[in-house]
Regions:
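Generic alpha-helical segment signature
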Residues: 11, 24, 37, 58, ...
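Short, solvent-exposed coil/turn linker segments
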Residues: 17, 35-39, 95, 328, ...
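Hydrophobic alpha-helical membrane-insertion signals
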Residues: 1-29
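Short amphipathic alpha-helical interface patches used for protein-protein assembly/oligomerization
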Residues: 90-94
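Basic, short loop/linker segments at the boundary and entry of helix-turn-helix/winged-helix-like folds
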Residues: 24-67, 72-73
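Anion-binding and metal-coordination hotspots
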Residues: 4, 66, 73-86, 96-472
Length: 472
């Protein structure tokens, strides 16, 4: 039997309660129940005048608007406002009645630029939600997984100019310089001369590139980098073999249960190993015992940083980068007592020098190697001298190799796909994390903070709901 819809129902006048229109198991209802949103008032109280100006929009409502946007992965604030106008659940979550006027799409942007810009409000919101997860004893920070993903910036790839780049000091540069000087002195070598002031920048700990103003007169021998004229704070990122985009790098840490513990926003052209210190500083005093990272973080400086702090680095196996047909580095045995290397033909490679990068160079005797039957497998140098390098912090890398081969470490490393990689996949698929519609690092930080906050809160709310159902 066919039933025809009566269009008179569209104009039917009814007395309804907004709360009755939102299902009890709706996501926004269980999220609203999960935490007390009044904590936002304490965070923003100093950003409002107590007795001057017109009454403002409720700060909680103001923060919940972008929260809805990132929770549901809505493309823009303009589209978010349109969805709020017709979605009863969104109105209920914001505390709006059915006939209340929805704020204009520019309201949040104006409040951000006038009140919130230059503050750490959104990082505080993220931290408060994370503390709630700690309060329920859901977070286990003993094993921390760290990785980075890239978010496409709102920048035209064709609108760019070249800039002169002056690389800033790495976080370990001063410590490495002292180690090099000490090592050279132990071998009877003079200290290396300091580089020109133009080639170095002191007082930095992040390892970022510092740029001069736009210029057309780029020196042939100077390092240049492509910089967007639309969003200069983004970085030129190589995405795949033939594709490049302007992007931001989001370095993130989580525990073994998938709770996001911290993040750091950097230009997309910065390598993970250079930006690690910024994130690591935010993870101090959380009780971290193991730090699981991918091959991009496998450097002597990071190994030393973690081991000196009592944290076990869990690095993956990294195959040798030797050319095919040549001896691998591990085939040259290091004699710690005599401080030399022994080649596969039992010849000695003696210490030569320690370079600026912190590598000790061990060289063979060219006259002996010239007559060696393994010369074609050892070196292709014209003077027949084989050079093997060893970092001044190589013992830390050897300690990390011992940790890697410990029982259970391989299995622990395999959990990356279930933790940090799953977080990135979920954020990109469900929360609009593939690209950003915002300009600048500050606004990108806001987006990341609220996105990760809503992911933690969503997970917390669902766990609380399961507990309530079990206790019912």
């Amino acid at each position: 039997m066919i039933t025809e819809q009566n269009e008179k129902a569209r104009k039917q006048i009814e007395f309804v309660c907004t709360d009755d229109l939102v299902p009890q198991d709706h996501l926004l209802r269980i999220i609203d129940k999960a935490i007390d949103w009044s904590f936002i008032y304490d965070l923003v109280r100093d950003k409002y005048s107590p007795d001057q100006g017109r009454p403002s929009i409720d700060p909680v409502t103001l923060i919940k608007i972008p929260f809805i946007q990132y929770l549901y992965g809505i493309k823009s604030m303009r589209q978010t406002i349109k969805e709020i106008e017709v979605n009863v659940a969104f109105r209920w979550f914001l505390g709006l009645e059915l006939y209340d006027k929805v704020p204009h799409f520019s309201t949040f942007g104006k409040n951000y630029s006038r009140r919130f810009e230059g503050t750490d409000l959104f990082e505080q919101i993220f931290q408060h939600i994370l503390e709630e997860c700690y309060r329920f004893k859901l977070v286990d920070p003993t094993e921390v997984f760290v990785d980075a993903t890239h978010v496409k910036a709102r920048a035209n790839n064709k609108k760019m100019q070249k800039r002169i780049a002056h690389q800033e000091a790495l976080f370990y540069e001063e410590m490495l310089r002292k180690e090099i000087t000490s090592d050279r002195a132990a071998h009877g070598k003079k200290p290396l001369k300091n580089k020109d002031d133009d080639d170095q920048s002191s007082g930095s700990s992040g390892g970022h590139d510092k740029f001069e103003d736009y210029t057309d007169d780029v020196p042939l021998d100077g390092k240049t980098i492509k910089c967007s004229t639309t969003d200069p704070e983004s970085g030129w990122f190589r995405k795949g073999e033939h594709k490049h985009v302007f992007a931001y790098g989001i370095e993130t840490a989580c525990d073994k249960n998938g709770w996001i513990l911290g993040f750091d926003v950097n230009p997309g052209n910065e390598h993970d190993s250079r930006t690690f210190k910024g994130l690591y500083d935010k993870l101090q005093n959380i009780g971290m015992e193991k730090c699981v990272v991918d091959a991009g973080y496998k450097t002597p400086a990071i190994a030393k940083l973690l081991l000196d702090d009592g944290v076990k680095p869990v690095f993956p196996y990294k195959r040798p980068q030797t050319k095919e047909g040549f001896f691998k580095k591990y085939e040259y045995v290091y004699d710690e007592y005599n401080d030399c290397y022994i080649c596969p033909n039992d010849q000695i490679l003696k210490y030569s020098t320690t370079n600026r990068d912190g590598y000790k160079e061990y060289k063979s005797c060219g006259h002996i190697c010239e007559k060696c039957e393994f010369l074609g497998q050892c070196t292709a140098s014209k003077n027949h001298v084989k050079v093997v390098t060893r970092h001044v912090w190589e013992e830390y890398m050897e300690a990390c190799e011992d940790i890697r081969q410990t029982l259970g470490m391989k299995e622990l490393y395999s959990h990356r796909k279930e933790t940090i990689e799953r977080i990135f996949g979920t954020a990109k698929e469900n929360h609009g994390f593939r690209y950003t519609q915002m300009y600048g690092k500050a606004r990108m930080t806001m987006k990341v903070a609220l996105t990760f906050a809503c992911m933690n809160l969503k997970k917390l709310a669902k766990i609380q709901q399961e507990w309530d159902l079990k206790m019912a």
